[in-house]
């Protein structure tokens, strides 16, 4: 009924009580936790939030608990709603990929272990950064500023992104 209309809204985060009859599930009760209403009136926030939802839809398997990734998604939606939507999205993707086993090594040179201070190269097959002295064949040079932001995002939890200054 209309008392549950919020449950069908885009980005609704709620606790649902379902009943099942003849292999069909029906929402009997729903308690809204957050509607993330702030993402709806801004196209950039809306698209960033849509990427989070699509990531969850594509990469979190039904019936397989992914508490860390789900919690990161909720925090990212809050960050997208209240903070910088693109930083919140990028931080979510980096953290969620890491949680699902596809993390990137961004804190030091993968080959020599030294801190990267100037030119930086990213190798996509190994998902790692390399310094100029150790760059493997096929690695792509990226801007140091890009590397710095990605490295900072990887070191922060998604919950802390909306309060961060990565400039």
List each model region and its residues.
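Non-catalytic alpha-helical scaffolds and adjoining flexible linkers that form interface surfaces
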Residues: 1-167
